[in-house]
């Protein structure tokens, strides 16, 4: 079985704290060259010994970390600690790095015990068998949890707030009582609705007399139809006046409730009585016109013009059996002769829109047919048509430029080696570059150097991959970039008139007339 993450973390923490206690000057070898450290600031002296948190300082780089631990060697050696918890996770690129968080207690000679939390990030080295510290942060945890106790000042403030709130509530109640009294004083007087009632009764009196008077029709004269218009006018005035009476009754006060109810009942009875009488009068007039005859002995037909809008009413009337009680029929017989026809209800009037819909109903139902369009099948193109669809020089040139923009990387060259591209080698000797690369990555077969870059061929692919993952390396104080090598762009030796894709340019030639 291989080594687990738990084994790596426990072994690292044991060696780290053991090296801190035995030889702090060699503790910097655990860190990477660009590591960052946040540790206890041993140089600052706290004024209060009862403080449970110590100041910290940040150090960057392996050399500065080595100087920090060497300067405070005696203080670091006296460290004693106890670990309570250890947590760890994979992190970083491809989850190869390890994140460790340890909590516990530590102290030095002559100091109290401090609670701390220390976090590490371990990065695997190039060979993969060792790890380097890239980040190290320590944080001291405060232990000052003070209980909350009520003092005299806080109690006095709470009492003052309660007294202020009680005074404000009293003011609000007093203001609301004054507003209610003002509203009662501004309430409407009772005498005003009485005057309105009298006017209502006066207005309804003429309408009742007008509706009760029946039109007198002479059967010998065919021009008795305008009487129906007047009766219709009377019937229309009654509902309008009664609507106004209902609105005025709603304004009345509660004290006159009983009086208004009686008036409403009387108005409703008048409403029901008035339309029935006017309808009977209008029907009698219409029937009289239909039964009358002209002086020359010809009967009046529906096709002949009639004054006013009466023709529409005559054409629309259909006989309907009246649903009237026996008491009403007896009353009507007493006032009218026994030969009077039975009343017929007026059908609803036809509007221009309803007539238009009835006329066009047949047309609309017939024209609801749907038309389906079938797309013709695509025919294969002839070879002559394909020639004209070929791109011109600009299209081919743009296509070639797009293909050239995509870089092609070389993993293995023709000699079987694995090349990489190194940028920023200005002022760096070839021998030092070779020795540094072979020491960290593996055997170098060939180096092709220029002014500010170099191409290095490794023997194995593993060395190439490790170098590319490193990305940057510092050699003799010069930082170089390790990148992938691209393939050389092919030179075009095609003759003029032929493109890189092998197609020829098509020139238009003048058409020759056939004799």
Swiss-Prot record:
The modification Phosphoserine is found at residues 187, 282, 340, 398. One of its GO terms (biological process) is regulation of ER to Golgi vesicle-mediated transport. One of its GO terms (cellular component) is Ubp3-Bre5 deubiquitination complex. Residues 8-140 form the NTF2 domain. Residues 202-213, 330-341, 489-503 have a biased composition (Polar residues). Residues 157-410, 485-515 are annotated as: Disordered. Residues 418-494 form the RRM domain. Residues 504-515 have a biased composition (Basic residues). The modification Phosphothreonine is found at residue 336. Keywords: Phosphoprotein, RNA-binding, Ubl conjugation pathway. Residues 157-166 have a biased composition (Low complexity). Residues 168-201, 262-282, 299-319, 374-396 have a biased composition (Basic and acidic residues). Gene3D superfamilies: 3.10.450.50. One of its GO terms (molecular function) is identical protein binding. PROSITE patterns: NTF2_DOMAIN, RRM. Coiled coil: none annotated. Pfam families: NTF2. Has a role in de-ubiquitination. In conjunction with UBP3, cleaves ubiquitin, leading to the subsequent mono-ubiquitination of sec23. Heterotetramer with UBP3; contains two molecules of BRE5 and two molecules of UBP3. Forms a complex composed of CDC48, DOA1, deubiquitinase UBP3 and probably BRE5. Within the complex, interacts (via C-terminus) with CDC48; the interaction is direct and UBP3-independent. Present with 11700 molecules/cell in log phase SD medium. This is UBP3-associated protein BRE5.
